[in-house]
């Protein structure tokens, strides 16, 4: 599971309930931790040729911050397997 929290000043990135990093400002250029060009709900209309796409099976949207224990209880036993040839920002999840 992947989560992004923005509190007005800082952006926090979580993977499987563990904080991956945070930043007071969105990094640009070589400073980027994650390169997410767009994130939207709905179908892919095919306009973005040549880009990698990730399908998200389940999306949960909250209007509050979840505690670490709430995030941990959402995780199935065997959650993430990293493909050997994948870049660090792409994870293969079993949901």
UniProtKB/Swiss-Prot annotation:
InterPro entries: ConA-like_dom_sf, Sialidase_trypan, TS_C. GO terms for molecular function: exo-alpha-sialidase activity. Pfam families: TS_C. Belongs to the receptors of complement activation (RCA) family. Interferes with the efficient assembly of the host C3 convertase. Could protect parasites from complement-mediated lysis by sera from a number of different species. This is Trypomastigote decay-accelerating factor. It comes from Trypanosoma cruzi.
